[in-house]
Amino acid sequence: MPRSFRSLALIAVLALLPGLAACSTTVAMQPAKGANDPACAEIISRLPQSISGQERRWTDAQATGAWGDPASILLTCGLEAPGPSTLPCRPFDGVDWLVDESQADQNRYTLTTFGREPAVQIYLDYAEASSADIAQALAPLIRDYLPATGSVCSSASDLQTPAPTPAP
């Protein structure tokens, strides 16, 4: 192979490297305390390639997942299961989710599984991704691999006791 052709090929490869590196940026995340739970490994190894039109990205922490560029969906597995909460709790496809809307003015929600051990938490930019799409994509994995604790969503009306009937 002529030397000039090899030099040209090397220059072409070097010119492409920055573009390839930009396509494979890793999302920086923090693992949860229980990230080494085998149930999390089962879920992470089966995460979908795409959710709500957002493509999966590499992360730098165990038991995490990310989708979108920039990342609009972040998943962390291995959190402690939440106890009773004042947050809205919404069941979807056999999985109960606590919904934290405290950052809704910035298009952000945090969804946390309720009644599953360990818990999964999703950070969501709802301007870019649908919470229904996320729940639909992840519910089968959560049902199959995260054991239910027996806790379920309930509302204040579920807990109210009827007023006693006056005695005649």
Cite the ranges covered by each PLM segment.
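Extracytosolic low-complexity repeat regions of secreted or lipid-anchored proteins
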Residues: 88-168
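C-terminal motif of bacterial Sec signal peptides marking the signal peptidase cleavage site
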Residues: 18-22
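Short, charged/polar surface micro-motifs in flexible loops or helix N-caps
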Residues: 79-86
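N-terminal secretory signal peptides
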Residues: 28-79
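Bacterial N-terminal signal peptides that target proteins for export
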Residues: 1-12
